[in-house]
Amino acid sequence: MAVCIAVIAKENYPLYIRSTPTENKLKFHYMVHTSLDVVDEKISAMGKALVDQRELYLGLLYPTEDYKMFRKLHNSYTDVMCNPFYNPGDRIQSRAFDNMVTSMMIQVC
């Protein structure tokens, strides 16, 4: 079960963000952006001189149970991107994508 699902554009603005407890919506929005800052710091450190390879480690990014959720989300995102009426960079407003996210959030693993 997911508590928050976000799709972030390459330019760091949200294309889609949804959280289960709606009263914590701003908190999750903040957490998504701060986690992106950690990834940006690790990537920018790669360009600097002689970086210790252990410093680039972000942690286990795909536990087995989370891999299925990511695959389902990625397949649905690919369907949105392949829609000829979707303009890349616009907010995701697909009903099918929203239904898939809803099913992921209420699904008990």
From Swiss-Prot:
* Domain of life from the UniProt record: Eukaryota
Q: Enumerate the SUPFAM superfamilies for this protein.
A: SNARE-like
UniProt cross-references to Pfam families, sorted A to Z: Sedlin_N (PF04628)
Q: Which InterPro entries does this UniProt record tie to the protein?
A: Longin-like_dom_sf, Sedlin, TRAPPC2L
Gene3D superfamilies reported in the protein's UniProt record: 3.30.450.70
Keywords assigned by UniProt, alphabetized: Cytoplasm, Endoplasmic reticulum, ER-Golgi transport, Golgi apparatus, Transport
Q: Which processes are annotated in GO (biological process)?
A: endoplasmic reticulum to Golgi vesicle-mediated transport
Localization terms from the record: Cytoplasm, Perinuclear region; Endoplasmic reticulum; Golgi apparatus
Fetch the CDD domains from UniProt. Answer: TRAPPC2L
Biological role: May play a role in vesicular transport from endoplasmic reticulum to Golgi.
On subunit structure and binding partners, the annotation says: Component of the multisubunit TRAPP (transport protein particle) complex, which includes at least TRAPPC2, TRAPPC2L, TRAPPC3, TRAPPC3L, TRAPPC4, TRAPPC5, TRAPPC8, TRAPPC9, TRAPPC10, TRAPPC11 and TRAPPC12. Interacts with the heterodimer TRAPPC3-TRAPPC6A.
Indicate what this protein is called per its UniProt record.
Answer: Trafficking protein particle complex subunit 2-like protein
Source organism (scientific name):
Pongo abelii
- Give the source lineage, highest ranks first: Eukaryota, Metazoa, Chordata, Craniata, Vertebrata
